[in-house]
Amino acid sequence: MLHTKIIDASVEKIEISNAEDFLNSSKFGAIIYFVGTVRDNNENKEVTGITYDAKDSMVIKSFEEIYEDVESELNIKNKAVFIEHIKGYVGLSEKSIIIGVACMHRD
């Protein structure tokens, strides 16, 4: 089960609760999250925010290809993956990407 979405920052924000809602199931024994945020510097230069731009269909296709590669190599049953990435301006400490993975076993 895979959920992917590009979020328009001018319309909405990425919310971890969306990942929790998608991944919450009594079928899963483990859930892990990665949350990317904007930091205040890059290569020793001050940063006040980042503007992300991409062709949505290409990004979604890349996420799907990564999912399919992992699925074929690891053969993990009863899994769910949630990926949302922001598009547009993201300020300091704001979320830019959320990746969540849930599976049946913790090994």
Regions found by a protein language model. Name each.
Residues 1-95, 106:
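N-terminal, polar/charged subdomain of small-to-medium soluble alpha/beta proteins
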Residues 99, 104-107:
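Well-ordered alpha/beta subsegment
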